[in-house]
């Protein structure tokens, strides 16, 4: 789930 990467972006 790359949804967590949205926070790091």
Swiss-Prot record:
Its main location: secreted. It is found in: Secreted, Cell wall. GO terms for cellular component: extracellular region. Keywords: Cell wall, Secreted. This is 42 kDa cell wall protein. It comes from Nicotiana tabacum (Common tobacco).
